[in-house]
């Protein structure tokens, strides 16, 4: 449905903190960024992964080689929640892939992955040896890295030195559903699917900020969500 003009694409480098350099081709937003480089092994579900708040501050590397072939779904909301994404925007810093399919086909697709990245101002590189990159990350653990475009040098950035939970948590109290039971959900970077699952169990969900004092709440349960950053923090 959409075919990218491959001749006009810019080159960029992925530079790891140990000095390793991978060169790739840009298919997203053209801006130098830095963060923590991590890999994930799912074969499908890149719209969900990119919008997962747990990946805030991270440069995401799917191990599956071809990405983009089913495009990006159009947004639709139910009970105040996006049906096909895990939040209202992309949270990862950038996307690194092996092969990019600019042609896409799916009954619910609205745009290409590259178009979506550009709309959200998120860089993406393809043509990277993600197998070699994943092996390095598997051996050394998550590493700091940066995507560098010509003339846009930047420093490495460690997201774990900031309170990134505060950056992804809801700033306001929100309520979902009208179930029999009431659960206070402390939002440390919750995925929408967690809220969807609670709603299916006849639960009214009260979503509160990460630093909310819930000690005086009259409820049937407290749910502490997962989120980005080092769990030890």
Walk through the language-model features, giving the residues of each:
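Cysteine-nucleophile active-site neighborhood
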Residues: 219-233
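RNA-binding accessory domains that recognize and position tRNA/RNA substrates
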Residues: 5-182, 186-211, 231
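Short amphipathic alpha-helix with an adjacent loop that forms part of the alpha/beta core around
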Residues: 212-218
């Amino acid at each position: 449905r959409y075919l990218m003009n491959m001749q006009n694409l810019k080159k960029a480098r992925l530079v790891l903190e140990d000095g390793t350099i991978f060169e790739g081709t840009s298919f997203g937003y053209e801006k130098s960024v830095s963060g923590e480089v991590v890999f994930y092994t799912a074969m499908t579900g890149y719209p969900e992964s990119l919008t997962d708040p747990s990946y805030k501050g991270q440069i995401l590397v799917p191990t599956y080689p071809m990405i983009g072939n089913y495009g990006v779904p159009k947004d639709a909301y139910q009970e105040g929640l996006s049906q096909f994404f895990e939040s209202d925007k992309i949270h990862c810093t950038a996307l690194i892939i092996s092969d990019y399919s600019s042609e896409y086909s799916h009954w619910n697709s609205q745009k290409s992955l590259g178009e979506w990245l550009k709309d959200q101002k998120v860089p993406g590189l393809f043509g990277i040896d993600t197998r070699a990159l994943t092996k390095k990350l598997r051996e050394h653990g998550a590493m700091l890295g940066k995507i560098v475009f010509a003339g846009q040098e930047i420093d490495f950035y460690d997201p774990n030195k900031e309170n990134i939970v505060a950056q992804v948590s809801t700033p306001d109290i929100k309520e979902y559903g009208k179930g029999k039971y009431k659960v206070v959900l402390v939002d440390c970077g919750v995925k929408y699917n967690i809220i969807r699952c609670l709603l299916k169990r006849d639960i009214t969900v009260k979503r509160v900020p990460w630093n909310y004092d819930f000690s005086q709440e009259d409820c049937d349960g407290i749910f502490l969500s997962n989120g980005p950053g080092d769990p030890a923090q």
